[in-house]
């Protein structure tokens, strides 16, 4: 079943915020991964086939200036990615690391069978931050 088929005409099954983020995803796209200010997190869930790439661009004082995502997966995975990028923009790295899959799942009212989507978003945030920090380690 495609993501569109999954969400199409089933208003009672998914919260309106999931449908909104699916139909109008925020921050879709890519950043230049060769830019030292950009961190990339790529995660996947083999059980359902969802793959999520989330990128951050970090500026002064470790504040995330921009965030982009590309997700191949269900509507809940797309909505989780979209919401995650909205939440981390203008936050510091430390603030962004505090965002949990539970926060994302609660905001989107994800059903239990879709909680792995919010876990992917949390993991992608952490991996993007780790990639950024690894790129910017001080030289010995």
From Swiss-Prot:
Transmembrane stretches, start-end = none
Q: What organism does the record attribute this protein to?
A: Encephalitozoon cuniculi (strain GB-M1)
* Cellular component terms per the entry's GO annotation: mitosome
Q: How is the cofactor bound?
A: Binds 1 [2Fe-2S] cluster per subunit.
According to UniProt, the name of this protein is Iron sulfur cluster assembly protein 1
An annotated Gene Ontology molecular function: iron ion binding
Biological processes per GO annotation: iron-sulfur cluster assembly
Q: Which CDD domains match?
A: IscU_like (cd06664)
Question: Pathway it acts in?
Answer: Cofactor biosynthesis; iron-sulfur cluster biosynthesis
Q: Could you tell me where this protein is found in the cell?
A: Mitosome matrix
Q: Which UniProt keywords apply?
A: 2Fe-2S, Iron, Iron-sulfur, Metal-binding, Mitosome
SUBUNIT field: Component of the core Fe-S cluster (ISC) assembly machinery.
According to its UniProt record, which cofactors does this protein need?
[2Fe-2S] cluster
Q: Which InterPro entries does the entry mention?
A: ISCU, NIF_FeS_clus_asmbl_NifU_N
Q: Which family does it belong to?
A: Belongs to the NifU family.
Q: Does the keyword Metal-binding apply?
A: yes
According to its UniProt entry, the function of this protein is described as: Scaffold protein for the de novo synthesis of iron-sulfur (Fe-S) clusters within mitosomes, which is required for maturation of both [2Fe-2S] and [4Fe-4S] proteins. First, a [2Fe-2S] cluster is transiently assembled on the scaffold protein ISU1. In a second step, the cluster is released from ISU1, transferred to a glutaredoxin, followed by the formation of [2Fe-2S] proteins, the synthesis of [4Fe-4S] clusters and their target-specific insertion into the recipient apoproteins.
Superkingdom of the source species: Eukaryota
């Amino acid at each position: 079943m495609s993501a569109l088929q999954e969400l199409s005409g089933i208003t009672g099954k998914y919260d309106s915020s999931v449908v909104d983020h699916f139909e109008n995803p925020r921050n879709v796209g890519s950043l230049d991964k060769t830019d030292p200010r950009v961190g990339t997190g790529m995660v996947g869930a083999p059980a359902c086939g969802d793959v999520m790439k989330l990128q951050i661009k970090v500026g002064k004082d470790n504040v995330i200036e921009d965030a982009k995502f590309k997700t191949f997966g269900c509507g809940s995975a797309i909505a989780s990615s979209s919401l995650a990028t909205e939440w981390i923009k203008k936050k510091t790295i430390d603030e962004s690391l505090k965002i949990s899959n539970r926060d994302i799942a609660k905001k989107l009212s994800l059903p239990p069978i879709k909680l792995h989507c919010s876990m992917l978003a949390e993991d992608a945030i952490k991996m993007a931050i780790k990639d950024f920090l690894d790129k910017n380690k001080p030289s010995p």
